[in-house]
C-alpha cells in the first residue's frame, strides 16, 4: 500500500508566505525558504507553493525563490501560479520544482492540461480545483481567480464534472481545495471528498479544513484520499508533522516516518 502523504501548503504573495481564511484577509507568515526548510526537516512528504495572485495579476510565478527552495530541501515540491504555457511550466521545472499545478489557467484553456501532460508526463501535472458548496443550490461549484477577492467568480462547472474532465485531459493528480472549509480548522469536507473520490482515478489530495490530527486520519480513513494538504496548523505550529505521522501510524495508517 502506498504511504499517505502529508503536504504543507505555502501560499506566496510578494515573495512571502501568507495565509487567509476562506481565501480572504491574508496575514504574513514569514519568508519562503526558511519555512520550506523547516517543513522538510520535520518530515513533510512534499510541499506545495501557490503564488496566489499570479493568475489574477496575469503574470507567472516569480521564479527567484523556486531555485532557492530547490537548493535547501530534498523532498518533492509543486509550484502553482499563472502557468499558462509549456514554456512557463518548463522554466519552473528547470528551476528545480518536481511538479507544476494549474488551476484558473486550466479553466480558461482546458487543452493546456493535455499539452503539459504530453510534454512533461502526467506524473508532474497537478490540477488544483477550488470548490465551493452553494447552500442555495445544494451544488459544489468550481471557482476561479480565488487568489483575488475582487475577481473570484463561479465557473459553469460543477466540481464532479470538472474532476472527470481534467482526468480525461491528462491530469496526473488532483488537489481539491474546499473553499468553505479553508482556514476554519473544523475538518475536511468528507462528504465532498467521497463524492469526488468516486470519480477520481488519479491521486486525490484533500485541502481545506485541517485543524487537528484526527482530521487527517478522517480524510484518509473515511474518504481514502492519497494525501492531505494543510497550511495554518503547520504555519502556526498547532500540529508538528513528526508527531502527526506518529499519531497516524498508531491509527493504522501507512505513512513514511
Curated annotation (Swiss-Prot):
Q: One MF term from GO for this chain? A: imidazoleglycerol-phosphate synthase activity
Active site feature: 11, 130
Highest taxon of source: Bacteria
Might you report a single GO cellular component term?
cytoplasm
List the catalytic activities from the record: 5-[(5-phospho-1-deoxy-D-ribulos-1-ylimino)methylamino]-1-(5-phospho-beta-D-ribosyl)imidazole-4-carboxamide + L-glutamine = D-erythro-1-(imidazol-4-yl)glycerol 3-phosphate + 5-amino-1-(5-phospho-beta-D-ribosyl)imidazole-4-carboxamide + L-glutamate + H(+)
Annotated pathway: Amino-acid biosynthesis; L-histidine biosynthesis; L-histidine from 5-phospho-alpha-D-ribose 1-diphosphate: step 5/9
Keyword tags: Amino-acid biosynthesis, Cytoplasm, Histidine biosynthesis, Lyase
A GO BP entry is: L-histidine biosynthetic process
The main enzyme category here is: lyase
Q: Quote the subcellular location field of this record.
A: Cytoplasm
What is this enzyme's EC? Answer: 4.3.2.10
Task of the protein: IGPS catalyzes the conversion of PRFAR and glutamine to IGP, AICAR and glutamate. The HisF subunit catalyzes the cyclization activity that produces IGP and AICAR from PRFAR using the ammonia provided by the HisH subunit.
Record text on subunit structure and interactions: Heterodimer of HisH and HisF.
Family per record: Belongs to the HisA/HisF family.
Q: Spell out the protein name for this chain.
A: Imidazole glycerol phosphate synthase subunit HisF
Organism of this sequence: Vibrio parahaemolyticus serotype O3:K6 (strain RIMD 2210633)
**Gene encoding it?**
hisF
